[in-house]
A protein has these predicted regions:
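Flexible helix-coil transition and linker loops at the boundaries of alpha-helical arrays
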Residues: 1, 9-17, 22-43, 71-80, ...
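Generic helix N-cap/helix-start motif at coil->alpha-helix transitions
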Residues: 1-2, 11, 40-50, 76-85, ...
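Structural motif corresponding to the intra-repeat A-B loop/turn of tetratricopeptide repeats
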Residues: 10, 59, 94, 128, ...
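TPR-repeat structural position
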Residues: 13, 62-63, 97, 131, ...
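TPR/TPR-like (Sel1-like) alpha-helical repeat modules
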Residues: 20-25, 139-144, 162-187
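Boundary/linker segments of alpha-helical solenoid repeat arrays
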Residues: 27-33, 77-81, 111-119, 145-154, ...
């Protein structure tokens, strides 16, 4: 699975799909792997289905995922949440927003929902026109994760949504936060972020522009 992991990280989903098709899942182990503390995780067969479903979704073949995902959900109860998420993502990619929303709502209706599930749920709500609810859930996602570098896209989307609903200061704070984190990590900054920040600076016409991540983070939480 090392090749699959590398291809996934590079976003080479066609390669992922080709590799999984060269493997017969029925001959793969169903014994869960364990970590150093003895906790059980994924097995080879469940990993195969995960890679296969993701590859189909990312290559615009989500309808094929829906043909087998329910069986997989029942087959691997330990990974149930992840496969149900893939079902929701398939519906979303196919434009079936109502079914996607229902599934994400159920997945997130727990004591401590994963931040990335909240993020995906919010995207569905945005497309449903429920922008205030989407913003609330995006902010819930942002405070649920301490790894800022993993949330640069989330911060960008919060910023763009804030701008869309007229919250200009909040929009700039989140876009600057995304930009500053990208700079610190040595990542490129999309023109859409830079251009929107300049536009907001012109609209706000003030001197409260944060110069570092801590300042931007504090402003985004106000």
């Amino acid at each position: 699975f090392k090749v699959l992991k590398a291809a996934k990280a590079a976003g080479e989903w066609k390669i992922v799909n080709e590799w999984v098709d060269n493997l017969n899942p029925e001959i793969l182990s169903t014994a869960p792997m364990t970590d150093e503390e003895g906790r059980e995780g994924w097995c080879d067969q469940s990993l195969w289905y995960n890679y296969k479903a993701r590859a189909l979704i990312e290559t615009d073949k989500s309808e094929k995922v829906l043909q087998f995902i329910d069986e997989v959900i029942n087959k691997f109860p330990r990974q149930k949440k992840f496969f149900i998420r893939l079902k929701a993502l398939s519906y979303y990619k196919l434009g079936n927003l109502n079914d996607a929303q229902d599934i994400y709502k159920t997945l997130c209706d727990v004591r401590r929902p994963d931040w990335w599930l909240l993020h995906e749920y919010a995207r569905v709500l945005v497309d449903q026109g429920e922008k205030q609810d989407a913003l609330k859930i995006m902010c819930q996602a942002a405070v649920s994760n301490k790894k800022l570098e993993s949330m640069v896209t989330l911060f960008k989307e919060i910023g763009m949504l804030c701008k869309e609903i007229g919250q200009m200061k909040e929009a700039r704070a989140h876009l600057l936060l995304s930009s500053l984190i990208r700079t610190e990590q040595g990542w490129s900054i999309p023109e859409s972020i830079s251009n929107t920040i300049m536009e907001l600076n012109s609209v706000l016409n003030d001197d409260k522009t944060p110069s570092n991540i801590r300042e931007a983070l504090n402003l985004s939480r106000e």
